Amino acid sequence: MRVTVTGATGRIGTQLVGVLRRRGDEVTVLSRNPDKARAALGVEVHAWQPESEPAPTDALAGRDGVVHLAGEDVAQRWNDDVKRRLLSSRELGTRNLVAGLRAAEPRPGVLVSASAVGYYGPRGEERVTEEAAAGDDFLAQICIIWEREAAAAEQLGVRVVRVRTGIPLDKGGGALAKMLPFFRLGIGGPVAGGHQYMSWIHLDDLVGIYIAALDGSEWSGAVNGTAPAPATNAEFSKALGRALHRPALAPVPSLAIRALYGEMSRIVVTGQRVVPQRVQALGYSFSHSELDEALRSALAG
């Protein structure tokens, strides 16, 4: 299979490229920094400024599939400039990718585009499947626009899969990496009461879902990239403490999270109980469906 990947130097993209190469696929990467990407990944890399130009057709024509992961990192303190980048990197980047697909001949057969469980907004204890309506907060609005731009490729005859990603378990980045220093010191614990759900997923399974979406002609539309058993923040904290053999009893008040992350803290102190109903119906078998085992694996990797 010939696959083009954007956002390939991030934690998800790096592992995805590695898995694709190990199974014998030919991988091409689109990157803002081609020298860095080439050195890190050892694959063919084409320069692309996603917010200002269509994706280069020579990196798309004749490919079997495209995986679109590029976008500004959400896990940072938001201000007006960061919020602008969060939206424009996804809206314009995806629009310009589809513009490149429109000009490519022959076109790839499938586009697998990242989205996020933030699409649903805060949902409390509701069990959220792919059929649930979108939320109305800032992150939900970004996801709606992001998915709309990706879905435009369907008009070109391209099969489109939108992966609403949860919280990847990766000690090298993301939410888990930010939690680890506190838990290792024995000062970690539930955040804002710990009742909010965390829709986690092992990085191996998230990459597995992207590959299944590339390979499977029956995959289309939105799928939830989460493990089957979301946990409350309190349950997650206890499991992480067990994995590290450290106590996890120090509660973190919501005021402290708001002081640290500002508006972005809403993602941390609220949550969604998201389940991968369509992913399981499509036959995907999770390698890491139990939280304690998944955390041990992620920390050992």
Short names for language-model regions:
Residues 115, 148-171:
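Conserved beta-loop-beta element that borders a ligand/cofactor-binding pocket
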Residues 95-137:
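Conserved Rossmann-fold NAD(P)-dependent oxidoreductase catalytic core, especially the SDR/UDP-sugar
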Residues 156, 169-178, 213-223:
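Glycine/proline-rich active-site loop of Rossmann-fold NAD(P)-dependent oxidoreductases
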Residues 216-263, 296-301:
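Mid/C-terminal beta-alpha module of Rossmann-like enzyme folds, strongest
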Residues 178-201, 205, 212:
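A conserved pocket-lining segment of Rossmann-fold NAD(P)-dependent short-chain dehydrogenase/reductase
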Residues 266-301:
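C-terminal amphipathic/interface module of NAD(P)-dependent oxidoreductases
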Residues 3-23:
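N-terminal Rossmann NAD(P)H-binding glycine-rich loop of SDR-like oxidoreductase domains
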Residues 35, 39-93:
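NAD(P)H-binding glycine-rich loop region in Rossmannoid oxidoreductase-like domains
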